[in-house]
Amino acid sequence: MGYEKFTWVIKNFSSLQSEYIKSDIFVIGGCKWCLLAYPNGKQNASYLSLYLDGPTLKTLPCGCRRRIRFRLTVVNQLSENLSRRGEGKRWFDKKLPLCGYEEVLLLTKLNAKHGGFLVNNEVKIVAEVDVLEVIGKLDVSKESQEVIKPRKRMRLYGDGGAVSSHLHKETSSVDVNGFQVLPSQAESVKRIFERHPYMALEFRAKNQQLRASCINVLLSLIKTLCQSLQDISIDDLGQTEQVLTFLQNSGFKVDWLERKLEEVKEKKIQEHIGKSRMQGLEEDLKVFKKKCSDIEALLEKEKEELKGLKQKCSDIEALLEKEKGKVLAAAARTPLTFDDIL
């Protein structure tokens, strides 16, 4: 059967007041499911908790069980490589109707301003479920499920602001230059071959799955190079070089992509050098500002001492003038006569 996907967008995440919120119920493999999220953690308030729940299992007779594979992903909307995913395989039954992760993502990372998990105050969660075995009756018959699948279902929770998008799974493919690609990829692949028509002339693989995998690798590489310099590391670029080598060894002529990679690498290196210089200059500025502050403080102290010395000079000058007046007064007195002395 393979995985089927359900996307849940939680709106107004930072203002949620409820202890937990639930998505709409969705149907995969004839079984009803929903997602359960604790915005402030179930046990640890530092983490987002996320669970997959089988809401009807509690009401089904004992012995009813579903064995599934599942993936729960908190999507990084800036870089898919940074998304946080957990996956597992297990039985769901009346006693164990839900499974998930108590600490799926640290809230400081989720709430980071440019972290990519919280965009426009929205958190995007994707559940992928593959029902492997069902013991007991289905919640929804296959016929009913076929009717339900194409319909979009969207509902706002009045107090939580959670929006559940429709169930979807891309199973069809489109041929572009001999490569089977998903409809969502067709336009991008078509543009690549329009700009570089001889890119795959030496690519000899006949297996369509292998051919599709190589195209996926190519698209992922281009997507990586389209990220902002802030979102891509030098290590990422090193891995990108390895991917490029893989494509070249597979027969793809991607010298144009190699040039772009070198351009991005050069810009990233310049950014790294610039940041190092900035850090050094910031440290120098900090030191010189401290010296200026110390000298200014010393100058203020010297000013106070100078002010005191000037005051002392003024006091001494006044005292000198006073003594000088006494001396002049004494000198101007009429001399005593002989008779005055006798």
Curated annotation (Swiss-Prot):
InterPro entries listed in its UniProt record? MATH-CC_domain_protein, MATH/TRAF_dom, TRAF-like
For the keyword Glycoprotein, the answer is: no
What is any Pfam family matched here? MATH_2
- Supply the alphabetized keyword list: Coiled coil
Q: Using the record's annotation, list all stretches that form the MATH domain.
A: 3-129
Database matches in SUPFAM superfamilies: TRAF domain-like (SSF49599)
Transmembrane stretches in the record are none
SMART domains tied to this protein? MATH
Q: Gene3D superfamilies, from UniProt?
A: Apoptosis, Tumor Necrosis Factor Receptor Associated Protein 2, Chain A
Look up the coiled coil feature and give its residue ranges: 253-327
Q: By its UniProt entry, which PANTHER family does this protein fall under?
A: TRAF-LIKE SUPERFAMILY PROTEIN (PTHR46236:SF11)
Name the chain's protein.
MATH domain and coiled-coil domain-containing protein At3g44800
